[in-house]
Amino acid sequence: MDDSTPYPVPQELYIPQKMKAFMAEPQGCALVAALEGQFQCSIVVINDHLSVISSADGVAVDINQIEKILRDVWRKRDVQIMIREAALNASCTHICHTLLPRAYCAVVLFFSSDLQRRSRCTDIIIDQFTGKVTMFGTEQAVNKAREMMIECLTEHFGLLEMNIPPTQRTTRMGYTNSYNPEIRTHLPPNSFLNSVFPMGEPNAILTSTPPTTSIMDEPLLSASLEKHLLFPSDFSVPPPRLSPVQELPLTPPKTCVVEKIKQWIPTTEVGKILGNRAAVKKHIERQFNCVITVHTEVQSSFGATPVEIVAQNKEQCQEARNAVMSLMQSHQDKPASNPPDSGFSTPGSPFTSDSSSTTPEKRGNSRQYHRGSFRDQPKVMLALTPRKLSPSD
């Protein structure tokens, strides 16, 4: 006789994709763990269905109740996020809003606490389902968090093929005047209101006794109102034109406006820009009126080095970046049999001539001149080199 107990049949229920994404978040995982301990069951998401299996023998689990709890918490979480965004939008000065793929959004969520701590921004709100990442704080803090997020994504996924939107102002910048309870508005005195609109007894409307001054004197009433009006009541005459109010700028004008672009190039190609005493870099800087900084101190795990381009406008930054990338592409297209030693002395370089780095005495020679060759060193250096003594001496 077989005494084996039958395996409990799982209960399945369809759930939407957004609710499924909520259950994958830390808050949703904690809620699922709490429900499993409370109902003594196992909750699993298979494709688009919520599967619940009872852990206790002979105890049925109501999957509808579990689904209702999950849905209520999920909806309350969305409402809390909306309230949180509205409060941050009114309390912070700047915001950075971007849409990322889900894999990118997961990396940002993993490092969100570190990004917020190092950039000192007010808050970072991340929605994994839509890939929406929103950063709030001051202008400096949000810009710092944006740069750190770009560097973090570049470290994990390589060069980004998407543009992260720049920092924008929030609605708080529109509210320049705050409420001051010490400043009172100028209202007509109560005596004037009582004289114009006599109410009589408090319960006059409930009693048959009419108020003391029930007869309205229209000329007197219009004269009283005329004194407290800004413009006369004669509408045939248009009101006088007032001088337009000069709106003060919200922020002081910037005295130094610069644009900055960061581009990653292969580490093996850094010598093309910095070779020959950085002649190519200086040429690009003079041509496009910009400053190029190659951050060789940055240790990258995927073999790329950041190049920072600072100019007065975006057009100059874009042109300088295109020049750098065309230089990299021109050297990558060359055959490997004749590799150049620097980016400036190459005949095929788009910025130089054929005889730019050769000395006058070497130009007539057909042999290619190498600056680092041992035979091209002065003979004085060879004479001053100490001789090596043989072991027999």
Curated annotation (Swiss-Prot):
Residues 345-359 have a biased composition (Low complexity). Residues 12-76 are annotated as: KH 1-like. GO terms for cellular component: cytoplasm; nucleus; perinuclear region of cytoplasm. InterPro entries: KH_dom (IPR004087), KH_dom_type_1 (IPR004088), KH_dom_type_1_sf (IPR036612). Residues 79-157 are annotated as: KH 2-like. GO terms for molecular function: mRNA 3'-UTR binding; mRNA binding. Disruption phenotype: RNAi-mediated knockdown results in increased apoptosis and increased sensitivity to DNA damage-induced apoptosis in response to ionizing radiation in the germline. Its main location: cytoplasm. Signal peptide: none annotated. Residues 328-393 are annotated as: Disordered. CDD domains: KH-I. Keywords: Cytoplasm, RNA-binding. Residues 259-322 are annotated as: KH 3-like. One of its GO terms (biological process) is mRNA splicing, via spliceosome. Expressed throughout the germline and in oocytes (at protein level). It is found in: Cytoplasm, Perinuclear region. It comes from the Eukaryota. The KH-like 3 domain is required for binding to RNA. May interact with wago-4. RNA-binding protein which binds to its own mRNA and target mRNAs to negatively regulate gene expression to modulate apoptosis and differentiation in the germline. Negatively regulates the expression of the argonaute protein wago-4, and may thus play a role in RNA-mediated gene silencing (RNAi) in the germline. This is Messenger RNA-binding inhibitor of apoptosis 1.
